[in-house]
A protein has these predicted regions:
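Sec-dependent bacterial lipoprotein signal peptides
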Residues: 1-10
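N-terminal compositionally biased, intrinsically disordered segments and leader/signal-like regions
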Residues: 5, 28-30, 49
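Short, well-ordered, aromatic-rich surface patches in folded extracellular/luminal domains
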Residues: 12-36, 84, 88-147
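Short amphipathic beta-strand/extended segments with alternating polar/hydrophobic composition
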Residues: 40-45, 63-71, 115-125
Length: 147
């Protein structure tokens, strides 16, 4: 009994959610040698937008220019996050491989499940499900461009 109470005090006995049940916000930044992209989603209501910005350098400053946007329901984002296993990404830090001179760097931040923060980053080293996640975001945005 005392042992169980001590585990609870340190968070060890707490149930952790295995799935995303709500998606409040998500930012994914991809950087390459000459610029990058920023994907944003904010799920404040049932119908929200997924946006992709291009990072540009103008007048001595970095600037985000909206490149594409599409309506995206919160449930669609939740399903994608679960399919790609983003809860497992939390704490991932992918070190840049030796003998690779350049590549893609990423930074992922999300708030899900009523306040749970997820953070991951890496350089040419990505968590499982990352490539599928980015392809799905690009696919959703491409569909809106074709309409």
């Amino acid at each position: 009994m005392v042992f169980t109470m001590l585990l609870g005090l340190f968070g060890c006995g707490r149930e952790t959610q295995k799935n995303v049940t709500s998606a409040e916000a998500m930012t994914l930044t991809l950087r390459v040698m000459r610029g990058g992209y920023v994907y944003k989603f904010e799920g404040e209501s049932d119908v929200t937008e997924l946006r992709r910005y291009r990072e540009t350098y103008r007048g001595g400053e970095d600037e985000l220019v909206l490149e594409s946007s599409v309506p995206c329901g919160a449930q669609t984002m939740i399903e994608l996050m679960n399919t790609c296993g983003i809860l497992r990404w939390n704490g991932f830090h992918g070190k840049h491989p030796k003998n690779v001179s350049d590549g893609i760097m990423f930074r992922f931040e999300a708030t899900v499940n009523g306040g749970q923060e997820i953070f991951a980053d890496g350089s040419e080293n990505f968590p499982k499900g990352y490539h599928e996640f980015v392809r799905a975001l690009d696919s959703m945005l491409a569909e809106s461009e074709n309409d």
